[in-house]
Amino acid sequence: MKPGDHYITNDPWLTSGHLHDITVVTPSFYRGEPVGLFANTIHVVDIGGLGMGPDGRQVFEEGLAIPIMPLAREGRMNEDLLHLVRANVREPLQVEGDIYACAACNDEGSRRLIAMMDEFEIANLDRLGETIIDASREATLARIRALPHGIYKNSLTMDGYDKPLILNAAMAISDDGIHVDFDGTSPASSYGINVVYNYCLAYTAFGVKCLVAPEVPNNAGSLAPITVSAPEGCVLNVKRPWPVAARHTVGHMLPDVVFGCLHQVMSGGVPAEGASSLWNPQIFGGGSLVDDVDEGTDANSLPQFSTVIFHCGGAGARPEKDGLSATAFPSGVRTIPIEATESVAPVLFYRREFREGSGGAGKFRGGLGQVIELGGACATPLALLCNFERVRNPARGRNGGQAGAAGKVTLRSGRPIRPKGRQTVPPRDAIRLELPGGGGFGDPRERDPERVRDDLLDGMITANDARRDYGVVVDKHGRIDLTETNRLRALRPPK
């Protein structure tokens, strides 16, 4: 390695779990000696192949694979590689620009590191790194050792592609750390919703750390006490060449699984289940990709494009707070403004709003999902790769809280749509996405009536929700009917 070198790969089994995520790694040098590596991962809008959907039966169908190889040597970009990438993706300028951005990001990180080392007269990072990693490991272990030791189990059923999947977890807590074993989890799917081991490890460890040691910095030391095993060949540990393009569909459920284990040992409770898995369809245009074209329209004249939208349902209610609405947990991905999508592709959003009544009822309400309607601008037909979970198995509540609303997918015209796989939105029609809500926490009859009224006035729930789930009646002037509310709550007091 030399200054100015950059390395690139999108190998799912080495990095982020599917071909759409490209990782760039850059060595950093101080006074001619290597002192560290900077790395970042970016989700590109397209990587060729079938796209970011679950329809592929092997990873070879899912796009262009880039093994670990030089992106640049001593500051000179590998033009042959970039030419190959541009030739294999539907949006070459965007993808190439993203790759350059990754390299620039690492370069900026390296410049700041060197400036810090100059300022504090640090020759290398060995002792500093060891100190941080050792301290972080001990801090995480201290939190783990304070928990009741034992083995705690939880199971979660999810929709799957064509049949339900079961994620089984057994969490062993000891002085040595936390080990999560996924023995008993469903076998691998024939479709691209499978998870590679490193992605399983990452989201399992993240779920544990969120609750056990959230304030400890993320590094090799703080994560070392959290270990994971998953049987080879199960949906959480597939080997090449099994399909993995939509691996987030399953992987994003893992924190909910481990939360269910930790709920049994954490006295303050843990959040209820949330929508968890992103609803992020890839949207295509082009005459060869759509099934519905107006009579008399030349299919060759339809615009060719590819884009991805990221949207999310509601998060689970917390032990002392309502769940966050339309918020991506555990991924942390920010929702793309609809104006940004409309500016880069012939896509038109007709509606985007909170989904009334979708948050699970509870002393603390689950976060709301959202309703989104979109179609092609100027009567353009669209092809979508759908990866929608929580349609048949909604997010469960906790401590007496109710489940969030299940997701729903339809066309505005009424034609049914499958929640997973390639679909077509005809000209002048629109797909309607009703994203799932998060589960509630605690008995709904314990919720402060004032908060129920506020939810009603804010359009978060309906009057029927307030009466049926919470035992709260609000008159036409927005005032709580205390007599009727007390009567309803007396009929079914909190458990």
Language model segments and positions:
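Glycine/proline-enriched, intrinsically flexible loops and inter-domain linkers
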Residues: 1-495
